[in-house]
Design a protein with these regions (language model features):
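Beta-rich carbohydrate-recognition and catalytic domains
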Residues: 1-39, 43-105, 113-180, 184-321, ...
Length: 368
């Protein structure tokens, strides 16, 4: 990859995730610390745009679910236009998402995917179940274990929690908690489904990205890797969580290049907020629930190999609040690309914001 193409890719990413131009599209339930909406994506299906995400209220999984409500509701919005306005049309509570006699104590990220027969909705929840016996002493009172479920329907408005089933779960101690699914088709011909997911070890010491694959004709996912992209060595040493895979338009300088995808990810120096030395370089460092953003690039014919672009420093930081900028997701249309993400505000809430980059602007960025 030439330096020129690398620079244009970075310019493209910054133009898409423009922190100053971002507009709020979904507000959290309160404009206060610990409240946000997001962690989902947008699809276009049957002539309508559909947006999924979860409302999160104050609480801390590191100290137990008794610390607050936390992941409260999975909501689905619709709009006839990619620019909104968005109307809430469907909602799932914790009790709605319970199955196999396991109580849901918190709702985390979700992901829509269009398939040949309709729509899939992947949902991550924390269920009230115990750690494996040999590490039970590490489990805090009131906490559970995360895994990922799936609901399938011909249309979005027909999604029903009564058909919910498990998608992936593991007893691997280093990746015991699985959440924040990112579903995508492995090819334009839909030869199978890829599922990135975030994992935490039983110690909650780090956040990692795993990859599961379900080939065409298969009914179940197989976990291919718990380390689809390695954690970084500086600003993202504690957390590297992929939140989106974006196939980059092949225009201008990219017309003669092999097809590429951009991978947005969340990163952090530590899962807890670090006490900064008074003489240190003051900066947002990222921590659990307040991550900041980076990106990587991968050639599609070499999937899942990913080249990290944000090696030494983060690329996406909110100019407000804690600097948190996370859960980036994108949707490509004929007119351009819409990006959404959670952005920290002055009141430390995290509404879902968006920015649209026109295809005309994208063509200008990659012009020869």
């Amino acid at each position: 990859m030439t330096n020129q193409i690398r620079e244009r890719l970075q310019k493209f990413a910054h133009s898409l995730i423009d922190q100053e131009k971002a507009q709020v599209i979904i507000e959290p339930q309160s404009n206060a610390k610990g409240f946000w909406f997001g962690g989902g994506n947008i699809i276009l299906h049957n002539g309508m745009f559909w947006l999924c995400g979860r409302y999160r209220n104050e609480g801390d999984s590191r100290t137990g679910v008794g610390a607050g409500e936390r992941g409260l509701e999975l909501a689905i919005f619709s709009s006839s236009s990619i620019n909104g306005p968005w109307e809430k049309v469907k909602s799932f509570s914790k009790s709605d998402l319970e199955h196999d006699n396991e109580e849901v104590v918190s709702i985390e990220g979700a992901s829509f995917l269009i398939n040949d027969s309709g729509v899939e909705l992947y949902i991550s929840t924390e269920k009230k179940r115990s750690y494996p016996e040999d590490v039970i002493g590490f489990q805090k009172k009131g906490t559970g274990v995360w895994d990922i479920d799936l609901i399938v329907a011909p249309k979005v408005d027909q999604l029903n929690a009564e058909s919910i089933e498990r998608a992936i779960r593991t007893e691997d101690l280093g990746s015991l908690h699985l959440k924040d699914p990112v579903a995508f088709n492995l090819s334009e011909e839909r030869e199978g489904v890829g599922l990135f997911f975030c994992s935490h070890p039983f110690t909650w010491a780090s956040s990692n990205t795993g990859l599961a694959i379900r080939r065409q004709g298969e009914e179940k996912f197989r976990i291919k890797s718990f380390n689809a992209i390695e954690r970084g060595r500086s600003w993202d040493v504690a957390c590297t969580r992929i939140t989106d895979r974006l196939r980059i338009p092949t225009v201008g300088l990219l017309e003669d290049q092999r097809p590429m995808s951009l991978y947005f990810y969340d990163g952090a120096e530590c899962l807890r907020s670090l006490e900064e030395n008074p003489d240190a370089s003051k900066r947002p460092r990222g921590f659990s629930c307040e991550e900041i953003g980076g990106m990587g690039i991968g050639y599609d014919d070499q999937f899942p190999d990913i080249l990290r672009f944000s090696e030494d420093f983060p690329m996406f930081i909110s100019p407000q609040g804690t600097g948190c900028s996370r859960y980036i997701s994108t949707i490509v249309t004929n007119d351009g690309i819409l990006a959404t993400w959670q952005q920290s505000r002055k009141d430390f809430s995290q509404p879902l914001v968006s920015n649209f980059l026109s295809m005309e602007s994208i063509t200008e960025i990659f012009a020869s």
